[in-house]
Amino acid sequence: MGEEKRGPEVAPLSFPDLSLALPYQDALLYAQNRLKMIARGGLLPFCEAHKFPYTTIINLKNGNLKKEEPRLLHRLLRSLDVQNELLQFPPDSPSQRFLLPDGEALATFQLQMAYFKAAN
């Protein structure tokens, strides 16, 4: 009898801490402000390095997206060093949320958002 091959150990999927979930609009506003911080001429190299569609990122930055782009925003936040996971909650909601890993990440996000709101 052959020995059964097993893959790497996979952690069970636990129930998410919903207090760490950001609404789509908050994540979008954060990303727009962070993109506006990139110096003139720096956005194209950023997009090329992270394999983002330049025109779509420009539209996101300027608030001209035709529809919500949660997967793009998820990738963009990760490229801006905001670790997150997409979360569909409530389950029948048309918008997704962005789950931060811990309270420290949430506090950092809130602090940076407060800075953006004060600057605008």
Predicted segments — roles?
Residues 2-45, 49:
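A short, Lys/Arg-rich alpha-helix, primarily the initiator
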Residues 5-7, 88-120:
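Short, charged recognition helix plus adjacent turn
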Residues 46-47, 57-60, 87:
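Conserved hydrophobic/aromatic packing and binding residues within compact polymer-binding modules
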Residues 28, 32, 77, 110-113, ...:
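Residue-level detector of alpha-helical secondary structure
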Residues 48-52, 81:
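A short, basic/aromatic helix-end/turn motif that makes direct DNA contacts
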Residues 51-67:
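Recognition helix of helix-turn-helix/homeodomain-like DNA-binding domains
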Residues 69-87:
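DNA major-groove recognition helix of helix-turn-helix/homeodomain DNA-binding modules
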